């Protein structure tokens, strides 16, 4: 029987060397828009490439943490339901903390390997390694979909009787003055009353 360290060393010896980079690691800002009752993460492929992770692994994580179903369509990810940029950003950052960043040197030059049925994060920069935790409950703080004073990018789904554009975010109906159906607008939430939100152009 091999011990854990020997199994890890054997696995590492069979993997190609990965060059480290001194370039600043920047996670792309999620580019979201809504289509009907779904949320589209338009630059999902770019995010997965930046993280150097399998898109399917990232997608499974996000759908589990968001508590929804989803699928990958080309370079986009489609999620059932309405989600905000803040919700996606929080979950992507949590994924990076657990599955990408080295806890010893803080660099993203890592690889996921499986050693004796244990998923291990191995750092190519400093050589550190740690088992990846299996989390049953998300540690991401759940936010309200929108908040007063917050700025959001919305797609206008309809126009109300008073001429205001109407968008839906989660349980909220957002009114946007001067917007027309199909517009993608950036707005600031002025007031929330129950499930109604009133905004102005940001």
Swiss-Prot record:
Coiled coil: none annotated. Keywords: Initiation factor, Protein biosynthesis. Residues 145-202 form the TRAM domain. One of its GO terms (molecular function) is translation initiation factor activity. It comes from the Archaea. InterPro entries: IF2/IF5, NA-bd_OB-fold, TIF2_bsu_arc, TRAM_dom, Transl_init_fac_IF2/IF5_dom, Transl_init_fac_IF2/IF5_N, Transl_init_fac_IF2/IF5_Zn-bd. Pfam families: eIF-5_eIF-2B, TRAM. Heterotrimer composed of an alpha, a beta and a gamma chain. Belongs to the eIF-2-beta/eIF-5 family. eIF-2 functions in the early steps of protein synthesis by forming a ternary complex with GTP and initiator tRNA. PANTHER family: EUKARYOTIC TRANSLATION INITIATION FACTOR (PTHR23001), EUKARYOTIC TRANSLATION INITIATION FACTOR 2 SUBUNIT 2 (PTHR23001:SF3). NCBIfam families: aIF-2beta, PRK03988.1, PRK12336.1. This is Translation initiation factor 2 subunit beta. The gene is eif2b.
């Amino acid at each position: 029987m091999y011990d854990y360290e020997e199994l890890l060393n054997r696995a590492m010896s069979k993997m190609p060397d990965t060059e480290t980079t001194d370039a600043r690691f920047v996670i792309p800002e999620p580019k979201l828009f809504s289509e009907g009752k779904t949320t589209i993460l338009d630059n999902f492929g770019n995010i997965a490439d930046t993280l150097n992770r399998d898109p399917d692994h990232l997608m499974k994580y996000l759908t589990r943490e968001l508590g929804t179903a989803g699928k990958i369509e080309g370079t986009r990810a489609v999620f059932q339901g309405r989600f905000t940029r803040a919700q996606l950003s929080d979950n992507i950052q949590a994924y990076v903390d657990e599955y990408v960043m080295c806890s010893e040197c803080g660099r993203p030059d890592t690889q996921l390997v499986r050693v004796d049925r244990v998923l291990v994060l191995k750092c190519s920069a400093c050589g550190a390694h740690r088992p990846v935790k299996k989390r049953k409950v998300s540690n991401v703080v759940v936010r309200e979909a929108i908040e007063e004073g917050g700025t959001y990018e919305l797609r206008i789904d309809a126009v109300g009787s008073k001429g205001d554009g109407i968008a839906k975010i989660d349980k909220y109906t957002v009114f946007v003055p001067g917007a027309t159906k199909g517009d993608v607008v950036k707005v600031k939430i002025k007031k929330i009353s129950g499930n109604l939100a009133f905004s102005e152009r940001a």
